From Swiss-Prot:
Record protein name field: Large ribosomal subunit protein uL10
Family: Belongs to the universal ribosomal protein uL10 family.
Keyword ATP-binding: no
Gene Ontology cellular component annotations, sorted alphabetically: ribonucleoprotein complex; ribosome
Coiled-coil intervals, chain numbering: none
HAMAP family (alphabetical): Ribosomal_uL10 (MF_00362)
GO biological process per UniProt: translation
Ribosomal protein found in the keyword field: yes
Length: 173
């Protein structure tokens, strides 16, 4: 089904809006994938907050022109699925994990603002923890000394109470 000029402009505007807010764009070739597999990928992408679409390459070229992702335009050849994400890791993680389980889905390239990534770089990015995981690790690291200090302070009255209980038990016996 061919799109008319107004529909194409709407698609370009929609993709341009997604790219403007994005931290990562990942491109993958999808030749010969079953519909149910692609549906599973879309469900997982939606759950992770990744904008996943199959688009005409010329429309995407227009959408990324004059953006920090313009370098990816040279990689847009063949039937491609586009993953666009505000989270720097989410699109890479979703698409890389899917490519592990489906050999007909091949990650071709990725981009971060003003940086083009190879498929290997996308795999490395996918292996990184998400922003939430990194923040929770940082918080745990910052909180550990304080928690240990509080436990140490709590130990003094606890030992005192145990000593009183031992004296009471000895006198009661």
């Amino acid at each position: 089904m061919s799109l008319n000029l107004e529909e194409k402009k709407a698609v370009v505007a929609e993709v341009a809006a997604q790219v403007a807010a994005a931290q990562t764009v990942v491109v993958a070739e999808y030749r010969g994938i079953a519909v149910e597999d692609m549906t599973q990928l879309r469900v997982k992408a939606r759950k992770e907050g990744v904008y996943l679409r199959v688009l005409k390459n010329t429309l995407v070229r227009r959408a990324v022109a004059d953006t920090p992702f313009a370098g990816i335009a040279d990689q847009l050849v063949g039937p491609l699925a586009y993953g666009i994400s505000k989270d720097p890791v989410a699109a890479a993680k979703v698409m890389h994990e899917f490519s592990k389980t489906n050999d007909k889905f091949v990650v071709k390239a990725g981009a971060m603002p003003n940086f083009l990534m190879s498929p290997k770089d996308v795999g490395n990015l996918a292996s990184m923890p998400s922003r939430e995981e990194l923040l929770s690790k940082l918080l745990g690291t910052m909180q550990a000394p304080i928690a240990q200090f509080v436990r140490t302070l709590n130990e003094v009255p606890t030992k005192f109470v145990r000593g009183l209980a031992a004296v009471r038990d000895k006198q009661a016996a």
